[in-house]
């Protein structure tokens, strides 16, 4: 297997989904690098969690520690400058007239994947892994399978490189995502994700629940909590 085919770049935010995807990639590729983005988001809690999660995941399995490669963080503040959303402004979370919550940052995943592909191109990496999902999600159009497939074609044509965008969570519920984490890394990985990853839109780390830290009221917390309860209840 060539180095291009043996290496993956994971979009790693510090949340539940991206941490599960990191474990998924470590289970399948010989070397895995991670990339995160500082885009002027409302809080930087997830970014702060990333180092602890990388350290923790490396301690779970020696082979994962050996495979875990470079970490990259890109600054793209322009995304926040052109986005009036609840993830980039201190405003209440609510539904918009278009049926999308105002947590939707237009083009965010498209921008992330494009920057990831540009970095992957420079580093000779063909495989890019993201935690997009259209099963338990808020209707974000840039999380849809058809969007990711179309972008894979565009990036491959635009850079003359046969990129493959992997979305292992695309058809999984949040309960099934918890189960996948258990299948990959046992209780140790589940506990690491529960205790150290961050999902809450409001950046709340003070409150501790059985499913992890968060306000417990925002859509992201509610989705994570519902998935946890279904997982522990055997409904994954």
UniProtKB/Swiss-Prot annotation:
Q: Which Gene3D superfamilies match?
A: HUPs (3.40.50.620)
Query: Top enzyme class of this protein?
Result: ligase
Domain of life, source organism: Bacteria
What EC number(s) are associated with this protein in UniProt? Answer: 6.3.4.20
Swiss-Prot/TrEMBL catalytic activity:
7-carboxy-7-deazaguanine + NH4(+) + ATP = 7-cyano-7-deazaguanine + ADP + phosphate + H2O + H(+)
Q: Which UniProt keywords apply?
A: ATP-binding, Ligase, Metal-binding, Nucleotide-binding, Queuosine biosynthesis, Zinc
- ATP-binding: present as a keyword of the record? yes
Specify the pathway: Purine metabolism; 7-cyano-7-deazaguanine biosynthesis
Q: Where Zn(2+) is bound, by residue?
A: 200, 215, 218, 221
GO biological process, any: queuosine biosynthetic process
Query: What does the entry's cofactor note say about binding and number?
Result: Binds 1 zinc ion per subunit.
Q: Which cofactor does it need?
A: Zn(2+)
Give residues annotated as binding ATP. Answer: 12-22
Q: Does the keyword Transferase apply?
A: no
GO function terms (MF aspect): ATP binding; ligase activity, forming carbon-nitrogen bonds; zinc ion binding
Q: Which family does it belong to?
A: Belongs to the QueC family.
Fetch the NCBIfam families from UniProt.
7-cyano-7-deazaguanine synthase QueC
Q: What does this protein do?
A: Catalyzes the ATP-dependent conversion of 7-carboxy-7-deazaguanine (CDG) to 7-cyano-7-deazaguanine (preQ(0)).
Specify the protein name: 7-cyano-7-deazaguanine synthase
